[in-house]
Amino acid sequence: MDGFFKVHYVDGKYFFEIADSLFGRDILIVNRVVKAPVDAQKRKVGYPGDYISDEVIRFEKGRGDKLFVREISYLEHSADTLGMYQAVLNSNVQPIVATFPLKTVRKEGETTNYVIDMTDYIRKDNEMFSFTSRVKDNIGASSMVDDASYIDTLKAFPQNIEIRTVRTFQRKKGGGSGLEKLLAAFFATSTTPLTYELNSSMLL
């Protein structure tokens, strides 16, 4: 699949082929709900299209045979006209939030492409492609059930990559208060897991 980077699906695994021309460029990830369980917490997050979170990342070549992903914060910034832009860049270190071993490196003319396996990272519970800890608290979810969570579809387009996942969570005991507890007891027992369909958009 050709998008702003190539996506390969081989033997049940998703491989991203990142060109070095994308290194250092901002990629926005926006997470939204597609479907949600019938649950009292739905009024907080749960209707189709409900916003979950967003973050900006950058890919970069790490040391050795690794590719790094940094989470980018713009809490501190400065306009070029103030002559402070480079000083701000030099005084802030953006965190490395993920590292991936290189599966292969491929040359295309002047471009070098780096291939990484993203399957487990996307499928497992992490804030880049799933709920933040704050949202999980709000919806009464705790740990993710691995064998009931999976990547549904992954599609590549020229300006975006669309990832749809199904994620099942254990229900947090004692979540919510007052009316929320009463409604939760009406809709489901405290041991009923919560299954969500989520969509993650990676935008260049």
Regions found by a protein language model. Name each.
Residues 1-204:
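Auxiliary tRNA-acceptor-end handling modules of aminoacyl-tRNA synthetases
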